[in-house]
Amino acid sequence: MSKTRRLLLLAILLIGVCCGVSAKTLVAYYSFTNNVRTIVNELATQKEVDVVEIQPAEEGLDYAANNYALGTQLLNAIKTAPNDAASYPEIKPVSADFTQYDDIIVATPLWWSQMAAPMQTFLFNNGAAMEGKNIWMIVSSANSGISGVVADAERLIPNGVFQSNKLWIKSSQVPQAASMLNTWLVETGQVSAINNQKMVVLSDPHVMAPGLLVSEGTAWTTYLSGQRKLVDYSQRLFDDMIVRIKRDLRPGLVLISGDLTKDGEQVSHEYVINKLDELRAIGIKTLVIPGNHDRGSNSDAVYYDGESTTAATVATNGWFATQYANYGYGVGSEREGTTLTYACEPITGLVVIGIDSGTDGNVSETTLDWVVEKATAARASGKKVIAMMHHPLMPHFAGVDNFVSTAVVGNYETVRNTLADAGIRVVFTGHFHTSDIAKDWNADMTREIYDVNTGSLISYPCDYREVTMSADFTDMAITTGRIADEALPKRIKVTDGNHNVTFELNETSAAQSLYNMLPTTKEVQNYSTNEKIFYPETAISYSSDCIEGACPAGTLALFSPWGNVVMYYGDASQYPGLYILGNAVEGAGQISELTGNITVSKVEIAKERLNTAVKNQIAAKGTAYSLIAPTAAQAFVIHAEGNETENASAATTLSTLVSAAEMGKAFIGEAKAQELKDMASSMLEDKSQYGTDRENVTNDLTLSIELPEAIKLAADGYSTYCSENRLDISRTTGVTAYIVNNVTETTVELQEVSVLPAETGFILKGTGNAWYDLYKTEGVADDVSGNQLHGTLTATLAPLNTFALSTKKGVTGFYPVNAGLMIPAHKAYLTATGSMARSLSIDGEVTGILNVDSYVNAIPAEFYSIHGVKVARPTKGIYISNGKKVVIK
């Protein structure tokens, strides 16, 4: 067989082809020392690419032996006759459809200042097919420059569009390849830059280190049998999530709200940290908080070895903080003593407070005081504050503690009120393994607070959150993504009503084609003595990625000449056109029993496991509960999917549960029956704070939240302010805004306003030392054309004749300040002639004395009450002095 034909036989399956999406970038690489392979493997996690590896036809050749004697010989042969195919060493067959691609990345090592010989063979054979393609170069070498490699590529791809920015990674730089690749990909426009206005929020990945499963056996299967979590897929799901973050989401910050590991095993934590290091290498920051499964004694923290288990070493608080120093517990963070609660500013202007709710779901009063202190300090600096905590902040439906005793943080009302009063508007939580957002308020219902509970990465539906922030962090847009569909293996179920077989499909295009046309009902037929067959709804599409081979019992295959699907219950040998689709994982022995019409449907691994686990959990409560367990489990699945009221099955499921609770009164009592009704209604109508004046429905999957600007008024109840945003003061209770519409020699006349244009200086009046939230608006602003206040968005040097709002000896007014002093950011000042301080006059009514300086420096000798009675020692109040009304505060 000719070399050219061999080059067209073997394909490496391209992800885009399997999924029915045309890929845009092909990476062709050759690696001898594994350096280029390492680089390309990392590249594939940062950019969606299809990869083909170039391999010598003869295995085991040592090109480096005897000072690269063989490698030099091959290069010399090419140099001698570069246009002769016989000059190039043979390589294993490679197939690639170049018409699919706009961009081709050639990744190769350098041999003696030239391109490695096997890569030259590949380009010699395929260079013409790369005409008009964008050609990118990645070269690895010890020290030599790469110009010779580039020259070889340009010779072998004469009509390629070579890109000027080549990436040269020296052998010594391979450990830094992730960072170098990211920089190169961003600079060349192949991927988007890391977005510091975006966060990704994960929770409860429960990663189990591969080494904990020494060997499969009853110890492992017994543990799994009661799980609703996909612990057996935890590594796969976490790995895929890390790739999605690096390649697709590219946020500036990742938050993980606890239960990082299966049960606190140090080896599992080490696995998690290694993956987080991948994010850090390309500039993505991560902050974590521990959950109840992450440290301390846990009987499930074991190695599984056949029928036995051995205890694994678990993390302590100190060990956890040390190991996660780069992820919340190191430089740049403040910790509350030796606890695992901390505060940091991962992105300028955004402070994150990680609250450790312990293994029992409690937050101490001392910790709460510390959190308030840090939140207050951050707000005083004009920064936005969010928090994360493992245990949910509030109940998300009535009776939630019937599912998990620690479903809500202990003393939750106090925690809720404290955080809300401290100006924390959003808390990201986990623990309950469902993605549900609940809203509540502080004690007097003047401040909103949201509990954004994110589901477990290994529990259906395997959710994560994507959070996009406005540039000033005043707007937060939350969306919800799911990882299971792409990360978990594809399974299908074949049943005739009495016999069931579950197959796990491989990743070939033919298997994907079958999966995409399900569900379907077909007649099963006997064929030969070892197989059952059926004809799919439409022809299965397949490509060169299909797998031929022997088919042992339990194999699912496509017989392409006839287009039928084959289920083997006896061994079969390899046959031309017989392509393997997958293998039975359950019920292989029932294939031979299938008869009549069969239904072939998709199996949702995560959903099925959750449904089964919850059903068993409820049934275990007793006979009466077992009767409603299937429906109750369905209700919980609907809840896990979020936005329950949009689910077509929710109303029917609720009606069934309410009826069942009513009929079950005789067995469980009226109180318990009502509790079940409330739980079902709250859950399936998506109502948090059910049955109270706080009851509300909040979108669980897509939500925009305002993070208002905050200002603390001075002790006298006045402050100046200036914002980048248009503000609607009418939305804020208890505070009034004013602009200055006239300045005289003795007074500053104020005019009340409601909607202020952006970058407008103004005065706020309210309760002294109180915090107020200020909200953005798109509404029409008031006319402030006559405003004489100058706002500052950044710290500004005071010009000549500057006056600032202040209180001296109990008198509030505008006092002169020295030129050159710094006016803080987001404040306002006046400029006026003279050096006399000015009083405040609101709507023509003087609220301070006419001559502030005179009052401060020497109190007038005579004061009279408004009724004309002379007052020898005036206290706070309104008086007449020198024929003018004055106010003493």
Where does each model-flagged region fall?
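Acidic/histidine-rich helix-loop elements
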Residues: 66-82, 206-238, 301-311, 324-331, ...
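N-terminal active-site segment of His-dependent metallophosphoesterases
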Residues: 193-266
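Binuclear metal-dependent phosphoesterase catalytic core
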Residues: 436, 444-488
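His/acidic metal-ligating clusters that form di-metal
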Residues: 233, 238, 243-253, 285, ...
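Extended active-site neighborhood of metal-dependent phosphoesterases/phosphodiesterases
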Residues: 266, 270-373, 445-448, 453, ...
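A short, polar beta-strand/turn micro-motif
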Residues: 706-733, 751-847, 887
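N-terminal beta1-alpha1-beta2 submodule of the flavodoxin-like/Rossmannoid cofactor-binding fold
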Residues: 24-106, 113-115, 179-186
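C-terminal outer-membrane/trafficking sorting elements
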Residues: 21, 739, 845-889
